[in-house]
């Protein structure tokens, strides 16, 4: 009976420790050595130009324009036009470099500390119940 209680306690402790380790954040990648991958690959040169698709010289009667179809409706305002409420950013103002990118949130590290304290509390409670 004592062997089964201690086996349950060891299994419970291993489960809680592995749970806390699985929730821990991964270490930050090191910037030492290695090859940096460029964000946009260079375009490859084509040896022969692609043949242009053939276009028929005379339009079909079904595609002929009528006065109703030739009149264009008024165009809606552009969605990306700058307004007074939303200032537009120029492409040079947007940063692509990873050194200026935001880091990972620190909320996960705080919750992992609480998870480890909770694991210790549950293990102590299980130890008291086993004894």
Curated annotation (Swiss-Prot):
Q: Where is the lipid attached (GPI-anchor amidated glycine)?
A: 108
- Alphabetic keyword roster: Cell membrane, Glycoprotein, GPI-anchor, Lipoprotein, Membrane, Proteoglycan, Signal
What does the entry report about post-translational modification of this chain?
O-glycosylated on the hydroxyproline residues.
Q: Which residues form a coiled coil?
A: none
Is Lipoprotein one of the keywords UniProt gives this record? Answer: yes
Q: What does this protein do?
A: Proteoglycan that seems to be implicated in diverse developmental roles such as differentiation, cell-cell recognition, embryogenesis and programmed cell death.
Question: What protein am I looking at?
Answer: Classical arabinogalactan protein 1
* Name of the gene encoding the protein in the UniProt record: AGP1
């Amino acid at each position: 009976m004592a062997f089964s209680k201690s086996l349950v306690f060891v299994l419970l402790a291993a489960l809680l420790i592995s749970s806390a380790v699985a929730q821990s954040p991964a270490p930050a990648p090191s910037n030492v050595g290695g090859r940096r991958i460029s964000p946009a690959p260079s375009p490859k040169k084509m040896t022969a130009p692609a043949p242009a698709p053939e276009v028929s010289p005379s339009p079909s009667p079904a595609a002929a324009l009528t006065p109703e179809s030739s009149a264009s409706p008024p165009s809606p305002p552009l969605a990306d036009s700058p307004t007074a409420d939303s200032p537009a950013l120029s492409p040079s103002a947007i940063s692509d470099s990873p050194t200026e990118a935001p880091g990972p949130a620190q909320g996960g590290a705080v919750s992992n500390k609480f998870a480890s304290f909770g694991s210790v509390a549950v293990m102590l409670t299980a130890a008291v119940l086993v004894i």
